[in-house]
């Protein structure tokens, strides 16, 4: 009882939990962020190129994968800032506006990725379970409208991050979206994030992928290879969801529940759970690597397009090289020809032509007759 009272008095005098174990997670965060950036950037660039080829072939699912890769690229562009932040012992020294934009992109990336995974599952579910009914109803235009709506909705929901505290105590020595302890408003928002951003989408994923498994078992129109592809895609979606997003949201809701029950003394718990929270944060970041590797490179059509584009690039390169070599040889021959013609012109200038010789002879004859 005395410890609780003492803790409550201490919490009234401070607004930030002291002695958070930031240094313990420094190496892990910097390493994971660096690896994700080094692998995720080229992988998502490749994904966007390959899925853009699929979009040109009127593949509906390519719209969602292409949007997912663009979302990941946007988040990956902020990772160098997070690396600097962690190396500076969690002191954000790049200005309040940069913190807001970076945090906004982080939150939007998580929930846009989750919703796009749901879109991919629902699209596969409709295409397989309602194959006849969905003909002519699944189109790229509808997919684009859905993606635009999701982007706009998530952006609007997270727009309050731009109205955070305008004048923090020390702009050059502040944390960036790391609130220890939580406040009532943020804890309530975390519950909403868990329900609408994780629990409901996860329920949709389980339902649609269960129906997909049932449909592929009884389907006679799909080959064994096609059935395996559909199953792998469904398994990949669930695995990504469980590994990358589930742990982060579970810890998020645990922190919020504990704060609601122990508002006067939550700092000791925050310090104890921080290392676990950091590991799960790294898992959510690894989603930027998992998406392109599992969704695009495993796909047979995309892989064929990749090799086809590589062969086409090599063919065009060889044609370009041969054309350059041909032009070079032609240029050399032309220069040699022009050089030879120049030499002949110089020699012709030195040797008198026939008309000049005839005129000389005529003038000599006239002089002889005159004498």
Question: What is the role of each PLM region?
Answer:
Residues 66-69, 110, 144-148, 192, ...:
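Internal alpha-helical transmembrane segments of multi-pass membrane proteins, especially GPCRs
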Residues 110-148, 211-215, 296-303:
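Class A GPCR helix-loop hinge within the 7TM core
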Residues 179-182, 194-198, 213-251, 263, ...:
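Intracellular effector-coupling site of seven-transmembrane GPCRs
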């Amino acid at each position: 009882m005395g410890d609780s009272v003492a803790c409550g008095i201490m919490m009234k005098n401070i607004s930030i939990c002291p002695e958070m174990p930031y240094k313990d997670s420094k190496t892990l965060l910097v390493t994971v962020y660096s690896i994700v950036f080094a692998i995720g950037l080229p992988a998502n660039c490749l994904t966007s190129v390959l899925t853009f080829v699929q979009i040109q072939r009127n593949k509906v699912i390519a719209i969602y994968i292409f949007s997912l890769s663009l979302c990941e690229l946007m988040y990956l562009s902020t990772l160098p800032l997070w690396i600097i932040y962690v190396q500076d012992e969690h002191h954000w020294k790049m200005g309040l506006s940069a913190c807001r934009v970076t945090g906004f992109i982080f939150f939007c990336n998580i929930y846009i990725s989750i919703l796009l995974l749901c879109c991919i599952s629902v699209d596969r579910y409709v295409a397989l379970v309602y194959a006849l009914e969905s003909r002519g109803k699944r189109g790229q235009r509808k997919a684009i409208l859905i993606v635009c709506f999701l982007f706009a909705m998530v952006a609007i929901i997270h727009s309050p991050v731009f109205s955070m505290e305008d004048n923090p105590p020390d702009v050059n020595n502040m944390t960036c979206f790391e609130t220890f302890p939580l406040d009532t408003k943020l804890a309530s928002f975390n519950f909403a994030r868990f329900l609408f951003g994780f629990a409901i989408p996860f329920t949709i994923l389980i339902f649609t992928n269960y129906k997909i498994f049932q449909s592929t078992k009884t389907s006679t129109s799909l080959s064994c290879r096609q059935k395996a592809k559909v199953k792998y895609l469904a398994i990949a979606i669930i695995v990504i969801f469980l590994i990358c997003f589930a742990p982060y949201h579970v810890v998020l809701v645990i922190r919020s529940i504990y704060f609601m029950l122990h508002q006067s003394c939550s700092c000791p718990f925050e310090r104890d759970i921080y290392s676990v929270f950091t590991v799960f944060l790294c898992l959510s970041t690894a989603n930027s690597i998992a998406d392109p590797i599992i969704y695009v490179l495993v796909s047979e059509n995309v892989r064929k397009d990749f090799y086809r584009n590589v062969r086409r690039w090599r063919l065009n390169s060889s044609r370009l090289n041969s054309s350059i070599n041909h032009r070079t040889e032609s240029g050399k021959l032309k220069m040699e020809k022009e050089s030879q013609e120049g030499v002949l012109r110089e020699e012709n200038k030195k040797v008198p032509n026939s008309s000049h010789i005839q005129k000389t002879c005529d003038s000599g004859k006239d002089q002889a007759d005159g004498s």
